[in-house]
């Protein structure tokens, strides 16, 4: 997808989310989630899940596009894919590998899995934006996606924290996450080593964003619709 098409898609998503925010956060008597006279708007669990699913799917699409763009421009003929298997910094976190495994996990545990993975990406996404600028002839398509993903990952994390507070009010969160130590690899002088570090990070981001997207859709079905979907 070219930059113009991506920009149009991003703009449409932001308009959708903005409209959702306006509709949900005005104290209008016709909206049951905001009773008449309420000082603070309380967004329903269903609406929180709707937003989270939209965001997670958007992030996964951007991650896939960014990985494909990087692979096409920098990784052809270098054999990176064979070295990238099972070398993600989040591999230390126990996560279900497929839908069948995820269905066996209690929703509270699955919510915590999502929080841990999202928190584990805060630091690498911040540095990814900075280091991508130093790539030789780095295309705007990669940089713009990196910036967008970092911002939307923060929004999704905030949304997930609100969901957890509604599903389990009063429960104190355990802020567990996997520490990323890959910054020196993104700054290596050897070009092949540096490009592989970028490739591996983007490969892992695509993998984890797909997992989160799948887990969220499963949780929405289970919690909001009582598995009747």
UniProtKB/Swiss-Prot annotation:
CDD domains: prolactin_like (cd10288). InterPro entries: 4_helix_cytokine-like_core, Somatotropin/Prolactin, Somatotropin_CS. GO terms for cellular component: extracellular space. SUPFAM superfamilies: 4-helical cytokines (SSF47266). One of its GO terms (biological process) is positive regulation of receptor signaling pathway via JAK-STAT. Glycans are attached at residue 61. The keyword Signal applies. The modification Phosphoserine is found at residues 56, 64, 120. Keywords: Disulfide bond, Glycoprotein, Hormone, Lactation, Phosphoprotein, Secreted, Signal. It is found in: Secreted. GO terms for molecular function: hormone activity; prolactin receptor binding. Disulfide bonds join 34-41, 88-204, 221-229. Its main location: secreted. Residues 1-30 form the signal peptide. Prolactin acts primarily on the mammary gland by promoting lactation. Interacts with PRLR. Belongs to the somatotropin/prolactin family. This is Prolactin. The gene is PRL.
